[in-house]
């Protein structure tokens, strides 16, 4: 099967910027107390459920996975970009990272106790998000949790330069209510939302959504 062009373009772009991206964002959590609070809540929920490891889907240079690991969560990372996987593995040799696409995860049904998708789903065209959210639902155990962070907007951007390099990828921005609807349609129910308004270092609002795959009644 031919790979969709947006995946090919996104992979190539992040292979190009991987090292510079890691230098810019690799320690970003140190100055993001609200994000750390949401990650801590997610970690507590995943540990309490005890339904399996967490996966950082679209893990980039691995800093979010490493933070969760430090909180006691067994976690591994998946990224579309082999160069990002290489950078993450070099930065955190004690963790496991591998290549993969969130559109077709090489994971068993119900294998995960938690999923983090941190600023990765916005690279998926809106019409393909149901496929991704269905994969999240499939791979989560009943009662498992999803933490999704992303930019807020209502537009589709095409980026041609990022992190000092030429790139070619899209960023598909949605309002939080629309993301919540799409998650619900996939069977993932949002229980908490953190919205950060534009401010220092942020040109756009950011949202963090905590969702859960319900257990059978």
Feature annotation, model-predicted:
Residues 144-150:
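Conserved beta-strand signature within the Rossmann-like core of class I S-adenosyl-L-methionine
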Residues 198-217:
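Core SAM-dependent methyltransferase catalytic element
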Residues 171-186:
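Short alpha-helix
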């Amino acid at each position: 099967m031919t790979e969709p062009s947006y995946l090919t373009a996104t992979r190539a772009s992040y292979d190009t910027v991987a090292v510079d991206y890691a230098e810019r964002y690799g320690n970003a959590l140190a100055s993001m107390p609200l994000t750390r609070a949401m990650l801590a809540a997610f970690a507590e929920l995943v540990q309490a459920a005890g339904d399996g490891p967490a996966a950082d889907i679209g893990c980039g240079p691995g800093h979010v996975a490493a933070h969760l690991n430090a909180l006691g969560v067994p976690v591994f990372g998946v990224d579309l970009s082999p160069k990002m996987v290489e950078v993450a593995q070099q930065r955190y040799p004690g963790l496991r990272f591998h290549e993969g696409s969130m559109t077709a995860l090489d994971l068993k049904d119900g294998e995960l106790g938690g999923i983090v998708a941190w600023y990765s789903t916005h690279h998926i065209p809106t019409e393909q998000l149901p496929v991704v959210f269905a994969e999240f639902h499939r791979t989560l155990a009943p009662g498992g949790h999803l933490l999704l962070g992303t930019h807020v907007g209502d537009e589709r951007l095409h980026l041609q330069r990022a992190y000092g390099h030429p790139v070619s990828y899209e960023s598909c921005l949605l309002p939080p209510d629309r993301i919540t609807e799409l998650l619900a349609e996939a069977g993932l129910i949002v229980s908490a939302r953190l919205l950060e308004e534009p401010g220092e270092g942020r040109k756009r609002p950011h949202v963090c959504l905590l969702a859960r795959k319900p257990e059978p009644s």
